[in-house]
Amino acid sequence: MTFNELNIAEPILRAVCEKGYNEPTPIQEQAIPVVLRGKDIFGIAQTGTGKTAAFAIPILQHLLKKNEQNIAAEPASTNEPGRARRNRRGRSHGKKEYRAIRALILTPTRELALQINDCFTDYGKYTGLRHTAIFGGVKQHPQTEKLRQGVDILIATPGRLLDLIGQDEVRLESLTHFVLDEADRMLDMG
């Protein structure tokens, strides 16, 4: 099987091919079609087998498709996504939310958060979708600024996520996709 046979959207397929990947790994071949059908999965595979792509590619596909549907549904005179007015803390002052977080990937360490963020950069570079990683051990301000600009996909460690939810910097009411990466490791950490 090839990535082309998985019916991946052209912008994502182009990015995957640019990375030099033609054939999915076993976890990708098993997981991607299931997630693309909107089903939940529980995946276990060794390190280095492509687990991140197994969830990143279908998430990108779903969000890209939803964006295309939203654009097609807008009146012809306003074919740009509406931007709600926001106050200094990034809160919306209009009826329409702009770039609400729709996917959350929770991971135990900053190193994993950065690796996952890099994968979304690589596979999503032609989609127009925005993503960022938030994690502790660094100043919050640069991370909250990225959040205020709007992100579709958030990669986070539990501690920083809880901090920013408590400060009303992260809102998850528009979430459609949730991934626990390395869930066993997070449970071991408490």
What are these regions (language model features)?
Residues 1-44, 54, 61, 181:
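Conserved pre-motif I regulatory segment
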Residues 5, 10-14, 18-21, 71-166, ...:
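Conserved nucleic-acid-binding Ia/Ib motif block in the N-terminal RecA-like helicase ATPase lobe
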Residues 49-52:
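Conserved lysine of the Walker
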Residues 58-66:
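Conserved structural elements of the adenylate-forming
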Residues 114, 188-189:
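Conserved D-loop-proximal element of ABC-family nucleotide-binding domains
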Residues 158, 182-183:
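Walker B catalytic acidic pair
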Residues 168-169, 189-190:
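Short, conserved "post-DEAD/DEAH" coupling segment immediately C-terminal to helicase motif II
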